[in-house]
């Protein structure tokens, strides 16, 4: 039996699919897991999951070493026993990140990362290893990739990159397939050698993202979306993938232009939809 990566949305907000209602709760998800799945890893995302540190701690107690938290880093980071790592979304150098996420957001996230490393680097514990960065490359930040890598190399553990996945045609943030996108991927391959063991993406995955690979229109075809069970805060399965919605009438991502890291990683190592 293979393991699955599971994403639970524990935040109370997601702008495309938000509905009011009580959280499904950790115990409900735990029961579902034990009855239905053999889970290898749980990624807790949002929204902002650190609004619910209590839920994060419960998961870490239940599955120590198999929990990661995807956060925007605007809430101070706490060391949690059993947490594999924090995945902090930092979308470029200061100017680019602030343009995407709002004035002052870069300073807040950077401060919280550095404060965490300083606070918990005691008694031989290497707190920097707990921090991975997540960079979603788009039409705003793609020109500053090396500046970004240079700034964080030697401070945090790794950076994982992906490309913006559109929900609408002519999305202004989408970095289209073609010359500029190829140039960025060539640069990432070069930087992987210049800054060893820092960029988490392997060459095969990066090269995959040069063109359409997983779907047609808004339908996943070769994409192994089945390998990632994505649940929202009510415990409902999100379709077609972790950035979708349980609501079939909601706007769906354009699979044909997918740049998501987790699915392209699985595809690049041979896990594909063959049905």
Positions of predicted regions on the chain:
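A sequence-level detector of short linear motifs
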Residues: 77, 238-240
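N-terminal [4Fe-4S]-dependent radical SAM core
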Residues: 10, 35-38, 225-228, 271-275
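Local cysteine-cluster metal-coordination motifs and their immediate loop/turn environment
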Residues: 1-12, 225, 253-263
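Residue-level structural signal for beta-strand termini and adjacent loop
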Residues: 55, 241-244
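Flexible loop residues that form catalytic
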Residues: 11, 47, 91, 164, ...
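Radical SAM enzyme core and accessory elements
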Residues: 244-275
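Conserved alpha-helical substructure of the radical SAM core
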Residues: 1-79
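Radical SAM enzyme [4Fe-4S]-AdoMet core and its adjacent flexible, acidic
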Residues: 17, 24, 84-85, 89-238, ...
